[in-house]
Structure formats: C-alpha cells, structure tokens
C-alpha cells in the first residue's frame, strides 16, 4: 500500500529535523572536544594537542589583549611610519581624556578573584614544560599608579614564578590596600615582610630589594634567577624568551658595570644623610672595604640565586653594603661593584675587557636623553618619541620597533598617562608571541 503524500512529507520533515539535531550535536561535540583537548589542568604541556594550532587558537581567543581603538599594532611593531604617526596623533587626542584605573576600581574588582583574573586575562597556567621547570623570582618595588603595577604584574605573571612586592611605606593607604587586594588573588605573589619608606637616591631603594631577597630565599619555589623591577618598567620579552636568555647565562649575572667617571666618584667621596630627602655632608668617607675597586651601573640586575645568597650571607658583601649605606644613589654602584667582586658567584673580573654597559647587559633597556641622536652619525639610538623625565625617555609608539630589536628582558620607562598606545601594542605583541611563539 502506497504512503499518502502528507505522510511522506511528515516522514521527510522528521528526517530533516533529526538530521539537523544530529548535526548540531556534532558541532557541539566538536567544540567540546577542542576545549577538552585544551584543558590545561589535565593536559601534558608537551603533548601534540596542547601544541596544536587549534589549541593555540582557543587559548589566544580567550587571552588576547588587543589594543583599543583602531591603532595598527602590527605595523607599529614593524616600524611602519604611517602606523606610528597615526598612533602618535591618536595619543594626542585621547591621553587628556583617558581615565586611568583607580585604586577603587581594583578594590572592587578583586572582591571576586576569579572574575578579576579572567576579566584582566592573566595567564594562569604554564605555557611550556621549559617554563614550568625554570621558575623566575621578581622583586617589585612600587609607590604609586596602581594601573601601572597591575599591568606590569599581568605582563610578567606565570604561576610557576614567585613575586615579592615592596610598597613604599609613604604611599597613600588606598594605594597600599589596592596592591594588597590584587596580590591576595595569587598564591605566588606576596607583600614583602618588611616595608621601608623609600627616599629617592637613598639607601632605602636598595633596602627594599634586600627585604624581598630575604623573603624570596625563604620561599619553597626553587627559582633560578631574580629580576628587580619598578613601577615604570615593562617586559619586552615573553616568559619563555626570558627562560631561554637566563639559561644561556649559565649561572652568570647580567647587569651594567663600568669604570666610574670623576663625577660619579663624588657619590661616595662624602657621607650623605637622609631626612625627607638626601643631604650632602662635609664628612669624608673612608676608602671602600677590602681594597675593593668601585664600579658604576644602574639599579637593575639579573642575578643568579647563588649571587643573591652571597649578597645576604658573605661577610665581604655585608661590609660593602654597610659602607655604601650613606652614599648617593647606592643602587647604582653596589650591584655594579659586587658584579666585579671575585668572591661573588656569576661575577666577572675587574679587567676593562669585562666592562658591561647598559646596552650590553640584558637587565634593562633605557634611552638616555644625552645619548639620543642621529644613528647614522654614531648615536646609540634615535630621539625619544615620547617625553623625558630626569633625562630618561618615557617611551612613545615611535620607540617600539627599536625597543623590540634589543636583547634586554625589560625596558624603562613606560607610563600610560604619557602614551598608552605603546603599552597596548607591547601587551598585544607579547601576548600573541607567548601563545603562538611568533610576532604579530
């Protein structure tokens, strides 16, 4: 008996409906399968699934940090002048209108830590076994601008690393509370156990790092190297690139260490006293202990764990530390001198062949106003595209291509109130490279 027409249509309709349901279920199953393959909590970091393009796409979709507005970050990082000019013009229009994230914003958003970490897109899992097996320690000294601190922390954060944060005792209470609120969301980020009031160019800047050194050595995290940062620093390498660079040091340290000029020698010729600021006295200092020749550098270092241990425990190191406490800007000659001391692990000899400039060391990339100029005429770098503070460039978008060509781990100075576009593009660049291993 033949099936009537309406029955045929009904069967065909049921068939199409079922086929549609099965297709929908297949799509859902495929998406779920992709998500499960990228479940970093249960996935082998060396597995093909984790390293696959599909998995990386899923990760990047959830963790990307695209620049706001319509600036061309890919072009800016490649040095495309049209993209750079557009970003600089855009910055002139928006920087006066831009409202930075406030202490109150962070106090509110961190009430729910999981929401905070997800919304601010912190990477909460190791991206490779190499990174997992090579934890890095950070000493982060801050005193203002909570947004700068949070963005720096997000940029250098990895769950296998360990972070000590020193907040200036003189900082506003709301700032200190906001820092505490942020770090309370991470098991591997903590406040230094001893906080000091930090006075510019005085011993207290070194003491802040020493306090973090003591705390970090007490940590159960088997970190290999210590990097120190301030609030205007930002990384220019991914965590994976940092691990590779630190492994290549093979136990050596990396920091500026050069023969001081006569001008710099005056910094330790007379004693300085501290009240609300640093004052020069007429009291002459004795020569450095242990007939140690003095060297000069900057406040930043890439130091091995063994070096840090000897800073705190070696009697000769302790004598030098006591001696520099009443000098001007001791952070700019203490580390540089210890780096040349023969008893310090990872140090290099006194000989002039081992002098290390800030451009040779990997600790920090800085543009000094006095050295800017025409590169074709021998200047080390082109003029700053941002502004200057204490003769140091606060970077603009026009500096980013040059920045990324250098081998340093971090650069200084950045400030979103001066140029947020350069920071946004650097964030986008680093996040893309962290996930994919390639540039924008």
Curated annotation (Swiss-Prot):
<dbReference type="GO" id="GO:0050892">
    <property type="term" value="P:intestinal absorption"/>
</dbReference>
<feature type="topological domain" description="Cytoplasmic">
    <location>
        <begin position="1"/>
        <end position="12"/>
    </location>
</feature>
<dbReference type="GO" id="GO:0060993">
    <property type="term" value="P:kidney morphogenesis"/>
</dbReference>
<dbReference type="GO" id="GO:0006486">
    <property type="term" value="P:protein glycosylation"/>
</dbReference>
<keyword id="KW-0325">Glycoprotein</keyword>
<dbReference type="GO" id="GO:0048729">
    <property type="term" value="P:tissue morphogenesis"/>
</dbReference>
<dbReference type="GO" id="GO:0003829">
    <property type="term" value="F:beta-1,3-galactosyl-O-glycosyl-glycoprotein beta-1,6-N-acetylglucosaminyltransferase activity"/>
</dbReference>
<keyword id="KW-0333">Golgi apparatus</keyword>
<dbReference type="GO" id="GO:0000139">
    <property type="term" value="C:Golgi membrane"/>
</dbReference>
<feature type="transmembrane region" description="Helical; Signal-anchor for type II membrane protein">
    <location>
        <begin position="13"/>
        <end position="30"/>
    </location>
</feature>
<keyword id="KW-0328">Glycosyltransferase</keyword>
<keyword id="KW-0472">Membrane</keyword>
<keyword id="KW-0735">Signal-anchor</keyword>
<feature type="disulfide bond">
    <location>
        <begin position="185"/>
        <end position="212"/>
    </location>
</feature>
<comment type="similarity">
    <text>Belongs to the glycosyltransferase 14 family.</text>
</comment>
<dbReference type="Pfam" id="PF02485">
    <property type="entry name" value="Branch"/>
</dbReference>
<keyword id="KW-0812">Transmembrane</keyword>
<feature type="glycosylation site" description="N-linked (GlcNAc...) asparagine">
    <location>
        <position position="108"/>
    </location>
</feature>
<dbReference type="GO" id="GO:0008109">
    <property type="term" value="F:N-acetyllactosaminide beta-1,6-N-acetylglucosaminyltransferase activity"/>
</dbReference>
<comment type="pathway">
    <text>Protein modification; protein glycosylation.</text>
</comment>
<dbReference type="InterPro" id="IPR003406">
    <property type="entry name" value="Glyco_trans_14"/>
</dbReference>
<feature type="disulfide bond">
    <location>
        <begin position="73"/>
        <end position="230"/>
    </location>
</feature>
<keyword id="KW-0808">Transferase</keyword>
<protein>
    <recommendedName>
        <fullName>Beta-1,3-galactosyl-O-glycosyl-glycoprotein beta-1,6-N-acetylglucosaminyltransferase 3</fullName>
        <ecNumber>2.4.1.102</ecNumber>
        <ecNumber>2.4.1.148</ecNumber>
        <ecNumber>2.4.1.150</ecNumber>
    </recommendedName>
</protein>
<feature type="disulfide bond">
    <location>
        <begin position="164"/>
        <end position="384"/>
    </location>
</feature>
<keyword id="KW-1015">Disulfide bond</keyword>
<comment type="function">
    <text>Glycosyltransferase that can synthesize all known mucin beta 6 N-acetylglucosaminides. Mediates core 2 and core 4 O-glycan branching, 2 important steps in mucin-type biosynthesis. Also has I-branching enzyme activity by converting linear into branched poly-N-acetyllactosaminoglycans, leading to introduce the blood group I antigen during embryonic development.</text>
</comment>
<dbReference type="GO" id="GO:0047225">
    <property type="term" value="F:acetylgalactosaminyl-O-glycosyl-glycoprotein beta-1,6-N-acetylglucosaminyltransferase activity"/>
</dbReference>
<keyword id="KW-1133">Transmembrane helix</keyword>
<feature type="topological domain" description="Lumenal">
    <location>
        <begin position="31"/>
        <end position="440"/>
    </location>
</feature>
<feature type="disulfide bond">
    <location>
        <begin position="393"/>
        <end position="425"/>
    </location>
</feature>
């Amino acid at each position: 008996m033949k099936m009537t027409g309406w029955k045929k249509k009904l069967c065909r309709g049921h068939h199409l409906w079922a086929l549609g349901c099965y297709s929908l279920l297949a799509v859902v199953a495929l998406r779920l399968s992709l998500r499960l393959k990228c479940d970093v909590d249960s996935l082998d970091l060396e597995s093909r699934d984790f390293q696959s393009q599909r998995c990386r796409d899923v990760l990047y979709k959830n963790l990307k940090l695209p620049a706001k507005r319509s600036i061309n970050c890919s072009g800016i990082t490649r040095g495309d002048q049209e993209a750079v000019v557009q970003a600089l013009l855009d910055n002139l229009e928006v920087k006066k209108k831009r409202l930075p994230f406030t202490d109150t914003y962070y106090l509110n958003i961190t009430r729910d830590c999981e929401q905070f970490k997800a919304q601010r897109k912190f990477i909460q899992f190791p991206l490779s076994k190499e990174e997992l097996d090579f934890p890095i320690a950070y000493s982060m000294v801050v005193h203002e601008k909570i947004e700068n601190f949070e963005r720096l922390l997000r940029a250098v954060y990895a769950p296998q690393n360990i972070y000590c944060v020193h907040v200036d005792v003189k900082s506003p209470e709301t700032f200190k509370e906001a820092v505490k609120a942020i770090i309370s969301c991470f098991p591997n980020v903590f406040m230094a156990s001893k906080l000091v009031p930090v006075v510019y160019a005085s011993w207290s800047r070194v003491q802040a790092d020493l306090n973090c050194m003591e705390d970090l050595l007490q940590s159960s995290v088997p970190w290999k190297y210590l990097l120190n940062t301030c609030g205007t620093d930002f990384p220019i390498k991914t965590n994976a690139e940092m691990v590779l660079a630190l492994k290549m040091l093979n136990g050596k340290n990396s920091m500026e260490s050069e023969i001081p000029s006569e001008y710099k020698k005056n910094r330790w010729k007379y004693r300085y006293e501290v009240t609300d600021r640093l004052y020069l006295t007429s009291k002459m200092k004795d020569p450095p202990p242990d007939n140690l020749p003095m060297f000069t550098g900057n406040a930043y270092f890439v130091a091995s764990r063994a070096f840090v241990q000897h800073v705190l425990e070696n009697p000769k190191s302790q004598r030098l530390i006591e001696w520099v406490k009443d000098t001007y800007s001791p952070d700019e000659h203490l580390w540089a001198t210890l780096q040349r001391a023969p008893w310090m692990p990872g140090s290099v000899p006194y000989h002039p062949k081992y002098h290390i400039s800030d451009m040779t060391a990997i600790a920090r990339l800085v543009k000094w106003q006095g050295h800017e100029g025409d590169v074709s005429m021998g200047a080390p770098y082109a003029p700053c595209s941002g502004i200057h503070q204490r003769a140091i460039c606060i970077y603009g978008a026009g500096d980013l291509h040059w920045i990324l060509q250098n081998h340093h781990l971090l650069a200084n100075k950045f400030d979103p109130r001066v140029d947020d576009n350069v920071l946004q593009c650097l964030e986008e660049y680093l996040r893309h490279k962290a996930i994919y291993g390639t540039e924008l």
